[in-house]
Design a protein with these regions (language model features):
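Interface amphipathic segments
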Residues: 1-251
């Protein structure tokens, strides 16, 4: 193809003009400097950029700073920092320039809203709170594979407040698989591992010193219980099967 030899500066251009190119809704003002050589089929170069007061795929930002290099048909993100009202994100790694756009990314999130991350993934689970998260993203832009570890705090699951929840997870675009999950909830602790699908739960759980009055509000039950078993059903209507033990229960 024809050769490329481009360089220039941009100042406060509207990010929305890049929405079609990136495949994501974008807003804000972009400034930067770039150099691109090679060809359309094999470009190489680099860019430094900043963006202010905008949004990328539902994530609001006050400021973005980044450096990207082009080569070997990849965009290599050597540094990208996003700061906004919902937290801070740092991104490093590579994105393929051409379909299917292979991904190798590491994303560190410092105190952001769980609801925003779920919305970014196109999910709507009844979970709120703050989360610190480290994830790696592989696969392709059309079919990303995500794995990571997280610490969530000061939030709720299905309306029940929790102090903190931590664990390791994978996400394949449809199912979330959790390993070594530890939650401080219902005035006790919960250890969970398994899979959550949009229409089904398949998890092994161990609940220790759980408050019945917190877990079953309005049912007249009181006391502390230990439960070990399996949870099925859905997020809206979970079903627990397994033994229950307690030193004292009042109903």
């Amino acid at each position: 193809g024809p050769s490329l030899s481009l360089s220039g500066d941009v100042s406060s251009i509207d990010l929305s003009v890049l929405s079609g190119l990136s495949g994501m809704d974008m807003a804000g003002r972009l400034s930067g400097r770039f150099v691109v050589n090679g060809s359309r089929e094999d470009p190489y170069g680099a860019a430094d950029f900043t963006a202010q007061d905008g949004e990328i795929h539902g994530i609001s930002f006050d400021r973005i700073e980044g450096h990207v290099s082009l080569g070997d048909q990849l965009a290599t993100i050597t540094s990208l920092h996003l700061e906004g009202p919902d937290g801070k994100h740092t991104v490093k790694g590579t994105v393929g320039l051409f379909a299917p756009h292979p991904l190798t990314l590491t994303i560190d999130t410092d105190k952001t809203r769980i609801e925003k991350l779920l919305a970014l993934a196109g999910e709507d689970y009844p979970v709120t709170g703050w989360v610190e998260n480290t994830m790696t993203v592989t696969g392709t832009m059309e079919a990303p594979q995500v794995k990571g570890d997280f610490l969530a705090f000061d939030g709720s699951v299905m309306g029940e407040l929790f102090q903190s929840i931590s664990g390791e997870y994978t996400y394949d675009g449809n199912d979330i698989t959790l390993k070594n999950g530890l939650a401080y909830i219902y005035d006790g602790t919960a250890i969970v591992s398994g899979t959550v699908k949009p229409d089904m739960i398949d998890m092994d759980v161990s609940l220790n010193d759980i408050s019945l009055s917190r877990m079953l509000p309005g049912r007249g039950a009181d006391g502390k219980v230990n439960m070990r078993g399996h949870v099925s059903g859905t997020m809206e209507d979970p079903v627990f099967e397994g033994p229950i033990s307690s030193r004292q229960i009042s109903v």
